[in-house]
Amino acid sequence: MSSESSFGLMQIGLATAEDIRGWSYGEVKKPETINYRTLKPEKDGLFCEKIFGPSRDWECYCGKYKRVRFKGIICERCGVEVTRAKVRRERMGHIELAAPVTHIWYFKGVPSRLGYLLDLAPKDLEKVIYFAAYMITSVDTDSRHEELPNLQVEHDIEKKQLVDNRDSDIATIARDLENELARLEGEGAKAADKKKARDSADRQMANVRKRADADIERLEQVWDRFKNLKVADLEGDEGLYRELRDRYGMYFEGSMGAEAIKKRLENFDMQAESDLLRDIIANGKGQRKTRALKRLKVVNAFLTTNNSPLGMVLDAVPVIPPELRPMVQLDGGRFATSDLNDLYRRVINRNNRLKRLLDLGAPEIIVNNEKRMLQEAVDSLFDNGRRGRPVTGPGNRPLKSLSDMLKGKQGRFRQNLLGKRVDYSGRSVIVVGPQLKLHQCGLPKQMALELFKPFVMKRLVDLNHAQNIKSAKRMVERYRPQVWDVLEEIITEHPVLLNRAPTLHRLGIQAFEPQLVEGKAIQLHPLVCGAFNADFDGDQMAVHLPLSPEAQAEARILMLSSNNILKPSDGRPVTLPSQDMIIGLYHLTTKRVGSAGEGRIFSSVSEAIMAFDLHELHLNSQVKIRLEGFVPYAGWEAPEGWEPGQTALVQTSLGQVIFNQTLPEDYPWVEAVADKGELSRIVNDLAERYPKVVTAATLDNLKDAGFYWATRSGVTVAISDIEVPAEKPVILAGYEERAAKIQGQYDKGLIDDDERRQELIEIWNKATNEIAQVMRDNLSPMNTINRMVSSGARGNWMQVRQIAGIRGLVANPKGEIIPRPIKSSYREGLSVLEYFIATHGARKGLADTALRTANSGYLTRRLVDVSQDVIVREEDCGTERGLVTPIAVADANGELVLDENVENSAYARTLAVDVVDSKGKVLAAGGTDCGDVVIAELFAAGITEVKVRSVLTCESSVGTCALCYGRSLATGKTVDIGEAVGIIAAQSIGEPGTQLTMRTFHTGGAVSASGGDDITQGLPRIQELFEARTPKGVAPIAEAAGRIAIEESERQMRLVITPDDGSEEIAYPVLRRSRLLIEDGQHVAVGQKLINGPVDPKQVLRIMGPRAAQKFLVDEVQGVYRSQGIGIHDKHVEVIVRQMLRRVTVIESGESDLLPGELAERSRFEDANRRVVSEGKTPASGRPELMGITKASLATESWLSAASFQETTRVLTQAAMEGKSDPLLGLKENVIIGKLIPAGTGLPRYTEVTVEPTEEAKANLFTGPSAFSDFSYDTLGGDGAPEFHAIPLDDYDLGSDFR
């Protein structure tokens, strides 16, 4: 099955100038794009046909060669190869740079890889690269050492000369002054003139001294600099550098810009540097050691790969193919072009100008400026805006550089590689199709015809309705009658996929068998709305067509809606009757006392139905009916002598009989009222005990009965159904009094504001509850609103309370509860003030929903990313470890009751060891799937806890094994090998996240009686846990077992533990207002929480170890979801938590090839240690690391997966430097490169199957007569000839396509 083009690794590396020239088909020398007159590409320009290939198929530039027959010829006139135009999508060019430039990713990225390698601060590196400082690239230390005495002598002589010159100049001036003064004396000049002469001479002397001292100082400076000169020294003073070079240029070399970096890299000794750094790490400490560790990572990357560090400095820039940066003509004759063309043009312009300046021999300062501009042009081409101000286009918009083409949601990875638009798909509005079966959907005729067009056309030709494809196409476009018949034939048993966005879990795409319908809307079965979260208020759905037989088979077997009855998150049914169906079935099965025909006895069901039709009998009257094939329910009292299979006279109602007729014949009789809970129990039971076909058929029966009887029930809502309780004013008056009393206490200063608020909130919550209760008691059982809520069809009591009772307390925009309630109900109408404060909460609810939906979607994306490579890879990893899970707990009276969370903990797991009762009898063997039945048996036998296999203890090196994962909740059977359990886990956690976010919406911001937690604790808390962040107001946990003492001071409290083992005391400073969970002198256990508040999972890991940290995270996450009434199975959370603890931080590397401080995959760490120990060397030591899901996703072994997730440029920079290979084990990597994903049927164990004949078959192959054995040819004719008959072809089933 494996194709020739398949490959198992994808490596990324640093490209050198040679590589770039090797990829290139020619050098781009001109900045021109196309000729605006002829609209043809300019020669040697950015779209040149000679370099990138012809712009028209099989046609050269000058037109000498046209047509495919000249394929492969290179035109001697224009130099263009005659080939397909699509080569312009793959052929690259290059620009030869006149001066090297550094790659901005390696110099400006954080951390700066170049800086780490050369041990330079990024600031200094920037000075060198952008021509602000010179860098010494080499020093001839030997000759300098030899010559130093001579140079010292020369220096001293020069210095002495300068001193002598200065002294002689000063002496000359002094002499001249004396002469001048003598002359003035002789002339009898005034004292002022003499002073003037003296001052002038003093000034001259001072100038001479100053100049000479400066020269001497400069000489000293140059000499000192030269004496101590070493490689990598920077010199920002150009004058000083020039002098240094003029005097001592033969002993050192220095330069500016990328050339300096290049020279350094050429002479860089990686091995020596690595040894030096390892030495520092072994013996150093503090800052120095940390920096050495970081530098060693970079040095090691170049040492262990074939990458050359010279790849970080470019001598040539690749030019990507022109079709990837197109230029298109708009309607007005103007051109729209990709930003890359502008950026390339700037590079070429500056490069050409630099070449010209170099040819002209321009002054160094001008050349350097041009080189700096070239560097900046290449920087903005690679990553515009990374350094300095971004280059902008028209309208001050920053241009999109090569990096921007990869980054973000619109980048290459997420837009084109991970998400593609597909052919054979369509979308339309959905409407309800109550007449459909569960596995069907209604497909509009026109849509179906368009989707199946190629198939219809081929079939028309096969059936001779059309001569060729062209005429068949014409027939289809004209909607000829034969077309519909053919379409009908083609779509039978050809499933289609329906998808509704947002696809939050795998049930968002399901397969259906299409039924052609009139109109333009897709018809959807009402029972699958829950899975799609669809309603019919204008939702749209997309249709996709599985084409290959394999795809159709998968759609039919795995994705058909009747095979997706269970929810993957908790294994409970998702296709439940809802709304109208519930009302119908509730109406059918309600008991009504005193109605027509009560107490009568009927000989058969048909007789009862006849009585009902004649209005002699009410649907809900209690009567006795003789039933055939009655399967008794628990608690039915059988008459004497009755045996199963006989008819039975049963006390029931006609509605109950009709309801039971919808269930399978051998299903126990259901006497309960069919409300939402009962229906859920029935469907759950059906899914657990019956084949899927039966379950699907039963669901359809329930749907049909539900809709029919909902119509017959005539349930409506009128304003008169809303009955406000008459006792309301009295109740309110009583609570008003109590509230006034509290307010009075506050006014007197007896209580503070916080206490007043708490008390008032408590009072009004009680009032609200009391009114709600009175209101419920007042509603008659036949009140339609009561029936809707009681049956679970729609709405809840909180909403009814707001309509008919009291609106209650509401929150303000900050989320604080306002301690004055809204006393009116909506039936009575709100006052202006009440209406105003009510709108706050409602508006906040809507705003929150919008914000938190985005957050939840992002959480799902991160969860998928971290767990996408968790696939079931093997049957059994062979571990003996597991988790101990409770199945029963003692209640207040000491009696055993089923643990409330057993459905999401022990259920659907594999038992790790035999479960044995107190007498030693094995109740369930290890390896048994722990379903509802097993749990019930164990509970009956008094077992309180079981040890089950878990993903957390699985020892598979990649992915997980089937037994540790247990039952697949979506199918109810043990998970298949190849199941992508990681993605299912992420979807199961993320999908309710979105529901959580939307929960505030329906209640209009009213506060539930429990003072309900809004999901503001919910979603942010889930994110905090999965990102392993330290929460706000963190509570310390005891690091050792011992006695605790509480020491109080003015500002804070200190909790001091004296450990039992006699080690030194441990103190925890906490705020004075903290609520303590311990008392002075109490004994605390390791890991015990000391004050009220959230615990930091990293502390749990450090103090109590990985197992405790895993359990803590699972329990906390489940706590948030359960508080919102959402059930997710523990195993999903465990899959994610396992991914968070997959890595180990290496502390000491021992003699392994791991680096200290490195984050290593646990399996790699253990393999390395095993190898080292087997050679008798010292293994590495490490500590388990808890990583948040974002960090874990970015730290994955697969660079393709990490780059397509976040921080694309950073990931690619690092991966290229390390020469990383992607083993293509996860799903994302394979989607990106377009390979079949290694999950499900894409696993090698399914695709790479070879069939070998058995020894027996091989033996049989050669036992027949050979060509050389004595074979009598006479048997073919003559007397004894066997008779040959012609067999009519119709006897063979050669399939419909044979003719």
From Swiss-Prot:
Residues that, per the record, bind Zn(2+) 2: 877, 954, 961, 964
InterPro entries xrefs: DNA-dir_RpoC_beta_prime, DNA-dir_RpoC_beta_prime_bact, RNA_pol_asu, RNA_pol_N, RNA_pol_Rpb1_1, RNA_pol_Rpb1_3, RNA_pol_Rpb1_3_sf, RNA_pol_Rpb1_4
GO MF annotation: an example: DNA-directed RNA polymerase activity
Lineage top rank: taxon: Bacteria
Family matches, as SUPFAM superfamilies: beta and beta-prime subunits of DNA dependent RNA-polymerase
Pfam families tied to this protein: RNA_pol_Rpb1_1, RNA_pol_Rpb1_2, RNA_pol_Rpb1_3, RNA_pol_Rpb1_4, RNA_pol_Rpb1_5
Entry EC number(s): 2.7.7.6
Residues that bind Zn(2+) 1: 60, 62, 75, 78
GO cellular component, one term: DNA-directed RNA polymerase complex
EC top class named in words: transferase
Keyword S-adenosyl-L-methionine: no
Residues bound to Mg(2+): 535, 537, 539
Annotated family: Belongs to the RNA polymerase beta' chain family.
Record's function text: DNA-dependent RNA polymerase catalyzes the transcription of DNA into RNA using the four ribonucleoside triphosphates as substrates.
Protein name as catalogued: DNA-directed RNA polymerase subunit beta'
Classification of source organism: Bacteria, Bacillati, Actinomycetota, Actinomycetes, Micrococcales
